[in-house]
Amino acid sequence: MRVGSIIPLFFILLSISCSKNTNNNKDSELACEGDFSTANVLVDIDEEIFNNDLSVNAYSRYAWTSEGSDRILTGNGIPNHQVGIFPNPNNPNAISEQNVSARFTLCPTIISEAGLEVIGPALAIAYAINSVKFDPATAGRCDDSGACSLARGQGRWNIEALGHNTFDFGDDMNHAHVQPSGEYHYHGMPELLIEFLGDNKGMTLVGWASDGFPVYARYGYAQADDATSELVALKPSYRLKTQADPNRPSVLTALIGGPGQGTTSPNIPIPMGAFTQDFEYISGLGDLDQCNGRFGVTPEFPEGIYYYVVTDDFPFFTRCLKGEI
């Protein structure tokens, strides 16, 4: 991972004007039947940026437009910021262009207070502004005996990508790595995307969830409904369980898939926090609900909206969606 210096990105000017206008009026006549409207926010973006990072060396292309009641994303999934070294010993995949095409409602509606779980490659839970996918869970699993695989394991214990040192998925400074398909994706805080968007200390809209609600990174108002209150790092409402679940493996006995596979007797302790099941949701413990979101005012939505938050602590990013997909 290169942490000593930041390699500059060269910005290629398009013949089409690039825009990040949050007050575009082309959808001002849209009458939403849902709970909220996002019609005039970030619906006129068209960017092409050359990323000369040694692990990328490609154009990052992404566009956000609207049509009727839909927000439309097209892009190539190439990050528009510095990344770590890929391939690397714990993530042997190179970044490559993807064909990203997705639609999101401009009129999101909450249909489940508990949230609907979204895990796996069939549906992206969210996309960042630069068309890079948010995919917080992993395919890594362990069985009760401690036999684990980082690549589609068969056990019932779900391995977390972040927050521990037992399993290394080769993630970089953006808490991201690369799938075998070449798709670079975020598991947590996209640090250099936030820097690119220009607001490391502000309330930064970094993407959109598949149900149409916005995604913000790290910060929010101390009083959710008061834009004059202090900006604070928002806290999730999850904590480590005081006791491990029955039959939870405590020692890694074999690594049978993924980087490092074939290590038959590693005998490495598996601390609490390595598995998704090690955490529990406690309503009101932090600022956010079970889907790592809340209702409140934001710079883009001064009247208030439900929004998800990327956090520094588990679950890092929502694992469920409250709106209709």
What residues fall within each predicted segment?
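Solvent-exposed N-terminal domain segments of exported/luminal and surface proteins
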Residues: 23-168
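Sec-dependent signal peptide recognition
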Residues: 2-11
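Bacterial signal peptide processing site
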Residues: 19-21
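Extended, compositionally biased non-globular segments
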Residues: 213, 227-325
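Extracellular/lumenal glycan-associated surfaces
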Residues: 129-132, 180-193, 301-315
